[in-house]
Amino acid sequence: MIENKINKLKELINKYNLDGYIIPKNDAYFAEFSSPDRLKIISDFSGSAGFAIILKKKNYLFVDGRYTLQSEIECGKYFKIIEIPKTLPKIILKKLDKKLVIGYDPQLFTSINLKKLFGNSCNLSAIDSNLVDKIYKEKPKKYVNSFYNLDANITGVSVSNKVNR
């Protein structure tokens, strides 16, 4: 199943004239629990932090030390697992033959984050629509959590005062 999704994504990578595509764990709001969890969709990785770079010939999953073993078990067959911050993508991409064009969803990254991760190691290309969304037909339900008001004696200000600011 993972292999099929990766292959479909690689077809889109070719269609968009890219050398690769970045898939983060976060959503557009940088929420810890995101829906859809595109990283899990493409890799089956269920940890709460990480990102993947799918290249034409190699797939990388970047995780912090908490998830090294877990990621090997869940998706090590299809991804080279890289522990961050020991190794950043820019170090790996600089070792490749040419300067790659890597696509990304601009709603899921900040320019500061991209610069930190990739530096000048590749050419980054913002793609209008998320490529994982294009291949994934069974959209999961949106993660929705209820919200509630806390009393002003806890927060120091009432909801109406805060909204009116």
Per-range role (PLM):
Residues M1-D97, D105-F109, N113-R165:
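N-terminal accessory/capping or targeting/presequence segment of soluble
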